[in-house]
Amino acid sequence: MSMLSRLLTALEHTEGVEAVTLHANGPQSAPGVAFAEADRVAKNWDLGACLQVYIEAEHAVLLDDVGDGRCLRLEGASGHYGRWRHAVERHRPLIGRMHEEVA
């Protein structure tokens, strides 16, 4: 099992998570568009750069800018932001070493 597979599997075991993907964060990708808009709002409010976007509706999505033009996407049940964020932070050193192909 590759390091990427182990990482995604570990994150999928976080409570409420139904799917995890790692994306190239291009400007036309859905995560890229969400980050661009969130970054625009953050800068307008003098908050600095946007590092994470959490969207909660019937389902929830957490987008995390992991660097190198990549975005980690967790999707699942609403109401688990704290757990998801903790899981991403706990795995951040491994994510930073990840140089495999992304979606």
List where the protein language model places each region:
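Acidic, low-complexity cytosolic segments
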Residues: M1-A19, H23-A103
